[in-house]
């Protein structure tokens, strides 16, 4: 299986991906991934195969879901379903946030603060986040665009930020990074 991921600056990135995630960091810490989604199921659908692969490689994974995802549909506990799915994919920690669904563009500053807090305070001391998976900048959903914008600011010191595609909202997604997740 191949997972397609967009990176705005992907020159020579394929070799760097495997190196960064199959070893400890230069500081001797365990490698970590931060996966960010606007709604429950965005992470699972957008980069779930990659997360599963890297969890098997003992990479520490934190997933952040910005909204409960309850607008426009009959209420179900989507955070609980997302927690179960992300646990099956091997995520070590899920942080469900409660920003207002379909209104994230009004909450970008608060999302940036939340993500910066999570990076600083929710990452174990022996883990260094070296990669972020987040929404991509060609998405048409207003919440996805807002999460992309907040992620780019909050994660500016993390060496690699990759955007993933979510079904039905990306009309012009042009992947530049491909990950092989075959075992």
Locations of regions flagged by a protein language model:
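Metal-dependent de-N-acetylase/amidase catalytic core
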Residues: 4-34, 106-183
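Divalent metal-coordination and catalytic microenvironments
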Residues: 41, 67, 82, 94, ...
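Glycine-rich phosphate-binding loop and adjoining beta1-alpha1-beta2 segment
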Residues: 72-89
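A structural preference for short, hydrophobic beta-strand core positions in alpha/beta folds
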Residues: 63, 95-97, 163
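Short histidine/acidic/glycine/proline-rich micro-motifs that form metal-
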Residues: 68-73, 100-104, 136-141
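A conserved beta-strand->alpha-helix junction
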Residues: 89-102
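ATP-dependent adenylation/pyrophosphate-handling site
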Residues: 32-40, 44-75
């Amino acid at each position: 299986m191949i997972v397609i991921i967009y990176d705005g600056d992907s020159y020579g990135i394929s070799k760097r991906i495997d190196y960064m995630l199959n070893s400890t960091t230069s500081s001797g810490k365990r490698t970590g991934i931060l996966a960010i989604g606007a709604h429950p199921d965005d992470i699972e659908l957008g980069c779930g195969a990659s997360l599963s692969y890297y969890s098997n490689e003992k990479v520490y994974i934190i997933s952040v879901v910005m909204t409960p995802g309850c607008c426009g549909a009959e209420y179900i506990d989507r955070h609980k379903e997302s927690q179960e799915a992300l646990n099956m994919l091997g995520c070590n920690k899920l942080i469900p946030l409660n920003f207002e669904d379909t209104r994230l563009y009004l909450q970008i500053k608060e999302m940036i603060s939340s993500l910066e807090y999570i990076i600083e305070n929710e990452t174990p001391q022996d883990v260094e986040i070296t990669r972020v998976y987040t929404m991509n900048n060609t998405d048409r959903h207003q919440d996805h665009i807002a999460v992309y914008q907040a992620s780019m600011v909050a994660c500016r010191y993390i060496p690699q930020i990759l955007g993933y595609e979510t079904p039905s909202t990306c009309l012009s997604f042009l992947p530049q990074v491909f990950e092989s997740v075959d075992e």
